Swiss-Prot record:
Expressed in the vasculature of cotyledons and hypocotyls, leaves and roots. Residues 26-108, 243-269, 332-370 are annotated as: Disordered. Residues 80-99, 246-259, 332-347 have a biased composition (Polar residues). Zn(2+) binds at C112, C115, C137, C140. Disruption phenotype: No alteration in flowering time, probably due to the redundancy with CDF1, CDF2 and CDF5. InterPro entries: Dof (IPR045174), Znf_Dof (IPR003851). This is Cyclic dof factor 3. Induction: Circadian-regulation. Highly expressed at the beginning of the light period, then decreases, reaching a minimum between 16 and 29 hours after dawn before rising again at the end of the day. Residues 29-39 have a biased composition (Acidic residues). One of its GO terms (cellular component) is nucleus. The gene is CDF3.
Length: 448
């Protein structure tokens, strides 16, 4: 009776936990049912039915708990995702200040004040100030702040010092007129003109000379100036015609090697001949004809001498030759040029007042024309008497008579050699016994 009244299970959080005694009693009841089934007792089914009902209730409670658990988990996940989304959205478009104020990201795209490009982006607020938004231009790689000045240095310029020199020539572009008559099909607008290395040499060697001549004849820039290299077959020689009436104005006479040389000689006389010889010898200040697209800038006559340039194939930055003074061209000793050197001539500049200074200038010009270079003479001191009689002392301003009266400039050297010979004569039998000591003595005396 006590087993029937006592609760066979404990309810905890909606679940029933059965005791082990209940399982044992259930096993004994099943054994009794098998034994008494043939006898037809009705009591055994009555005992079994409440236990089976308890088991069914336990299974139902377990299923209900499992069904309610995923619902609660789904609700928790939904709330957590909502919180994450709400926390992420203000961080993307807003910026918090130390005071707690939120600064919204501007959506309007501002053009670059330097290159007027619309490829810009907002970076951040400078010092968390809404009046100083900092932007970045992708085209010219520069930052600028509203209300401030723009950075003139491109981003990362300090790290590009060790790169090749060809990267500095990006500002040299090809004009539209040169683009229409280009030789190399690979060149386009806003591309590099200079190229270095073996590829550039192969291209220059393989390029024919006939299209270069066509370019020189046909090509002109819109403003009327010729921006090109002078070819070998069409060298333009500029001659200054100096007359007594108008010395300041010079006429540029364009002459070719084949046709108009005689005409220019007839017009300008000996001045043109002298300058033609100088120009032919110099070969356009050391520049040879470069087959390819002509240079898009005007010719600069103030260029360094030919020895200044490296051999082809080696990259070298190109800088104008502005600061180094150039030697003036050789003036011909003609009566026309002598008239221009008068004090009454209309040419600007200083004019010599004394005849002595003009004579000195003429002497220096003659020396330069003759190519005389002072080379110091070598003086051998094998014989001091002959060295004292040499002509080098007269060039230095030293009189030979005083040296001879005083006994010669190299008297000390002569005395030392005599002493050295006497010592060697006296010590020779002693030193001959020890060859090592003899060689050391020779080296010592030679060092002295």
């Amino acid at each position: 009776m006590m087993m029937e009244t006592r609760d066979p299970a404990i309810k905890l959080f909606g679940m029933k936990i059965p005791f082990p005694s209940v399982f044992e009693s259930a096993v004994t009841v099943e054994d009794d049912e098998e034994d008494d089934w043939s006898g037809g007792d009705d009591k055994s089914p009555e005992k079994v039915t409440p236990e089976l009902s308890d088991k069914n209730n336990n299974n139902c409670n377990d299923n209900s708990f499992n069904n309610s658990k995923p619902e609660t988990l789904d609700k928790e996940e939904a709330t957590s995702t909502d919180q994450i989304e709400s926390s992420d959205t203000p961080e993307d478009n807003q910026q918090t200040t130390p005071d707690g104020k939120t600064l919204k990201k501007p959506t309007k795209i501002l053009p670059c004040p330097r290159c007027k490009s619309m490829e810009t982006k907002f970076c951040y607020y400078n010092n968390y100030n809404i009046n100083q938004p900092r932007h970045f231009c992708k085209a010219c790689q520069r930052y600028w702040t509203a209300g401030g000045t723009m950075r003139n240095v491109p981003v990362g310029a300090g790290r590009r010092k060790n790169k090749s020199s060809s990267s500095h020539y990006r500002h040299i572009t090809i004009s539209e007129a040169l683009e229409a008559a280009r030789l190399d099909p690979g060149l386009q607008a806003n591309t590099r003109v200079l190229s270095f290395g073996l590829e550039a040499q192969q291209q220059h060697v393989a390029a024919p000379m006939t299209p270069v001549m066509k370019l020189q004849e046909d090509q002109k820039v819109s403003n009327g100036a010729r921006n090109r290299f002078h070819g070998l077959a069409d060298q333009r020689l500029v001659a200054r015609v100096e007359n007594g009436d108008d010395c300041s104005s010079g006429s540029s006479v364009t002459t070719s090697n084949n046709h108009s040389v005689d005409e220019s000689r007839a017009q300008s006389g000996s001045v043109v001949e002298a300058q033609m010889n100088n120009n032919n010898n110099n070969n356009m200040n050391g520049y040879a004809c470069i087959p390819g697209v002509p240079w898009p800038y005007t010719w600069n006559p103030a260029m360094p001498p030919p020895g200044f340039y490296p051999p082809p194939g080696y990259p070298m930055p190109f800088y104008p030759y502005w600061t180094i003074p150039m030697l003036p061209p050789h003036q011909s000793s003609s009566p026309i040029s002598q008239k221009c050197s008068n004090t009454n001539s209309p040419t600007l500049g200083k004019h010599p007042r004394d005849e002595g200074s003009s004579k000195k200038d003429n002497e220096t010009e003659r020396k330069q024309k003759a190519g005389c270079v002072l080379v110091p003479k070598t003086l051998r001191i094998d014989d001091p008497n002959e060295a004292a009689k040499s002509s080098i002392w007269t060039t230095l301003g030293i009189k030979n008579e005083a040296m001879c009266k005083a006994g010669g400039m190299f008297k000390g050297f002569d005395h030392k050699t005599k002493m050295y010979n006497n010592d060697k004569a006296e010590n020779s039998p002693v030193l001959s016994a020890n060859p090592a000591a003899l060689s050391r003595s020779h080296n010592f005396h030679e060092q002295i």
